[in-house]
Amino acid sequence: MPKGYIIVRVDVKDPEAYARYAAATADAVKKFGARPLVRGGKHEALEGTARARNVVMEFDSFEQARAYYYSPEYQAARQHRIGAADGEFVLVEGA
């Protein structure tokens, strides 16, 4: 079964609120078995506009990644991110 990935590209506007968001996601990350493959670090925009922070989370399946995003645990944590960062979240299925 192909793995699922959530790809996040954000520009953080409020580091304190974003830190609360990141800490609040811990329960959902553990519950859904998410594995962070990328969390920040060196990056280069090859095409398009770069974002300051890039994250890639791996899940056992597309469905598990989707369940993580829509879970009550993640949705509660997400409230800390609203207004703290601008960006995109994309759910993709691996090859």
Where are these regions (language model features)?
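C-terminal structural segments of small proteins and small subunits
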Residues: F62-V90
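Short S/T/G/P-rich N-terminal loop/turn motif that feeds into the first structured element of a domain
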Residues: M1-R53, E58-Y70, E93-A95
